[in-house]
């Protein structure tokens, strides 16, 4: 029996891939630089510390692999990406990134264009599994005459094809494949388009920073900014920085890392204390309950009140996506602080 088809963002979710490995190596290198107190100029050496060999592993050449790593270092420092093709230092003035204050600004998610392979967009293509059968159902069902037979095999005319998928649906050998750009297909708000040269581009007016494109790109061409550098610099500067732990931390590092060991490691990193995000989740639930009661009171006072329900989520991306998709219901969709934010409020009030 054939396995169930997975959505595009489900295909790599939960898998440890080289893309994830490279991302972690960059973050580790940046963290080590800050904790060891190395000079800011050492940032330029990070791509060479990560990629020590002289032959490419995943891309056309070693220079391209290091160029991608350079852009990932910028993201790890909370900086915007360089324009494609700009030959400049990773950070012109590193000091603003090595600070205890927030430096991250929108956009939070960006395309590393030198890593983008300009994947084919949504289209159908005949594979070498075509048997050149006599029935030729693919040709018969195409209302646009986009399927032709060349040298005994079916071929799709891209200029005529409208991507309806009927040919793939009726092929007895499943020889017609559906191709899609993973990042574009994973985006639920249609924020990813192709620029004039075919590279992926994010429409920041539409993007909700959910990160589905980040986990769906097999080439690691989309990344997110990090505030790790500023947090570590704050710890190194002696500021009281607390770590918030979600309930899932129990299984984050495998069965050998007990909660006691993880808490000890957090303290060893220099955090002043720890707090459970679950507390913030309880507070968020209580606040959402109050918002539901507000709607009930409004309806009791005026049965014709505009708000008929309350849409709530502690995910900011969900709230932005819902308001974008249903602008006429925007008043019914409430802002809810994430459990992380509610926990942070408690920490700041007590410390």
Task: Provide a role label for each language-model segment.
Residues 106-107, 116-119, 162, 192-193, ...:
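A short alpha-helix capping/helix-coil boundary motif
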């Amino acid at each position: 029996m054939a396995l169930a088809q997975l959505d595009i963002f489900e295909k790599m979710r939960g898998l440890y891939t080289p893309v994830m490995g490279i991302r972690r190596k960059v973050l580790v290198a940046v963290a080590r630089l800050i904790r060891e107190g190395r000079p800011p100029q050492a940032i330029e050496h990070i791509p060479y510390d990560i990629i020590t060999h002289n032959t490419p592993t995943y891309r056309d050449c070693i220079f391209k692999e290091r160029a991608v790593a350079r852009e990932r270092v910028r993201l790890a420092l909370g900086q915007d990406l360089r324009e494609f093709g700009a030959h400049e230092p990773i950070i012109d003035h590193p000091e603003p990134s090595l600070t205890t204050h927030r430096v991250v600004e929108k956009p939070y998610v960006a395309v590393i264009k030198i890593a983008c392979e300009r994947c084919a967009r949504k289209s159908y293509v005949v594979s070498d599994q075509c048997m050149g059968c006599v029935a030729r159902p693919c040709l018969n069902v195409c209302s646009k005459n986009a399927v032709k037979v060349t040298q005994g095999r079916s071929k799709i005319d891209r200029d005529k094809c409208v991507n309806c998928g009927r040919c793939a649906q009726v092929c007895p050998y499943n020889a017609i494949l559906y191709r899609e750009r993973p990042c574009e297909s994973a985006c639920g708000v249609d924020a990813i388009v192709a620029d004039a040269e075919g590279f992926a581009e994010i429409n920041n007016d539409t993007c909700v920073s959910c990160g589905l494109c980040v986990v769906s790109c097999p080439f690691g061409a989309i990344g997110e900014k990090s505030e790790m550098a500023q947090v570590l610099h704050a710890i190194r500067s002696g500021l009281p920085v607390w770590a918030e732990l979600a309930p899932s931390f129990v299984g984050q590092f495998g069965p050998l890392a007990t909660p006691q060991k993880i808490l000890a490691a957090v303290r060893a990193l220099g955090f002043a204390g720890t707090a459970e995000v679950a507390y913030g989740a309880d507070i968020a639930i209580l606040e959402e309950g109050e918002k539901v009661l507000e709607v009930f009171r409004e309806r009791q006072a005026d049965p014709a009140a505009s708000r008929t329900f309350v849409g709530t989520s502690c995910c900011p991306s969900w709230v932005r996506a819902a308001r974008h998709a249903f602008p006429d219901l925007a008043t019914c969709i409430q802002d809810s602080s994430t459990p992380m934010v509610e926990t942070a409020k408690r920490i700041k009030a007590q410390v």
